[in-house]
Design a protein with these regions (language model features):
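N-terminal beta-strand motif that seeds the catalytic metal site of vicinal oxygen chelate
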Residues: 1-18, 77-82, 133-171, 225-228, ...
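Short, structured motif recognition centered on aromatic/hydrophobic residues
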Residues: 6-9, 13, 29, 59, ...
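Core segments of cupin and vicinal oxygen chelate
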Residues: 12-55, 107-119, 162-206
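Short amphipathic alpha-helices in soluble, non-transmembrane regions
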Residues: 25, 93-97, 175-176, 241-245
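Conserved donor-binding loop and adjoining core beta-sheet/short helix segment
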Residues: 33-36, 48-82
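Vicinal oxygen chelate
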Residues: 35, 45, 91-156, 184-210, ...
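Short, conserved charged micro-motifs
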Residues: 88-92, 168-171, 235-240
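Intrinsically disordered, low-complexity segments enriched in Gly and acidic/Ser/Thr residues
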Residues: 220-256
């Protein structure tokens, strides 16, 4: 069995139109599908991704009734990143952010790759990460209708950063249950401890989950990151269900999320993971 890199990230927002305006008009992401929230059909669920709606490029946003004012804390998905083709693409987006008064910080490195931290419409810290020196899982397909030039478009998910109160517990889930490999570590200024890098599938930025054991922050934000999805084949999805049962990890049943099948579970620290199959947004 093996996982095949990142599949999607799910976030929540209380202002779905503002979210759409930011991610489509500012970042240039393609809206793949607008549908209803399965848990609350009065609320919307939007899917963004590359031109083909490929796994590894998907951002799912769920509308909620009220804004969530919570602190950055441990046992959460701290941030996610979005892949752009080159280092110069980061500069292009920096100019774009200046024009649109979008807050951003100085360029840093995530596992050796240049990344530009910025703050989205809900106050989340998101990283644009350069694919210039990346190897492994390839970028997705550009969208001809995007308002960002094809050579600079966001074409995939990059590393997802998890802040865990017990790094060993979350790490063991990644390696022993989901078959990721520990490949490296690096320093990130926001944390005292090293960030540990775990890799899925063919690796590279599109297959990385980064785990750090850090302290809670007093900084508040307006919405959170719900879960991270990892890609699997449909056959392997059933095998992972059996594995979760064998190690007594509570999990959902395999469910049909309209565009792909999925099973989700929480690790001992409360981080929500999904195992998801190849998407089809032509339904």
């Amino acid at each position: 069995m093996q996982t095949n890199g990142l599949h999607h990230v799910t976030v929540v927002t209380h202002d779905i139109q503002r979210f759409y305006n930011f991610y489509n008009k500012v970042l240039g992401l393609k809206l793949l599908k607008e549908t209803e929230n399965i848990e609350n059909t009065a609320m919307k669920n939007l899917y963004f991704g590359d031109n083909e709606g490929n796994a590894g490029t998907l951002l799912s946003v769920i509308e909620v009734a009220n804004p969530l004012f919570v602190k950055y804390t441990t046992d959460e998905i701290y941030a996610y990143s979005l892949r752009v083709p080159t280092d110069y693409s980061l500069y292009v987006f920096k100019l774009r952010f200046d024009e649109m008064n979008i807050k951003y910080d100085t360029v840093i490195k995530l596992n050796g790759k240049h990344a530009l931290p910025f703050y989205d419409c809900d106050g989340r810290c998101v990283y644009l990460i350069s694919d210039e020196h990346n190897k492994g899982i390839p970028l997705g397909e550009p969208d001809d209708d995007s308002n960002v030039d094809a050579i600079h478009q966001i074409l995939g998910l990059g590393p997802v950063l998890i802040n865990a109160s017990n790094r060993l517990l979350t790490s063991s889930i990644l390696t022993q249950v989901l078959d990721l490999k520990h490949t490296s570590s690096y320093q990130l200024a926001a944390f005292d401890n090293d960030v540990q890098v775990f890799t899925s599938g063919d690796g590279g930025s599109g297959g990385e989950i980064h785990v750090v054991q850090g302290a809670a922050s007093e900084k508040k934000r307006a919405a959170n990151i719900e879960q991270v999805g990892v890609s699997v084949t449909e056959e392997v999805l059933f095998d992972y269900k059996k594995r979760l049962e064998s190690v007594n990890i509570p999990h959902s049943e395999i469910s049909d999320r309209k565009f792909y099948k999925t099973i989700f579970f929480k690790d001992p620290c409360g981080i929500v993971f999904e195992l998801s199959t190849k998407p089809d947004f032509n339904l």
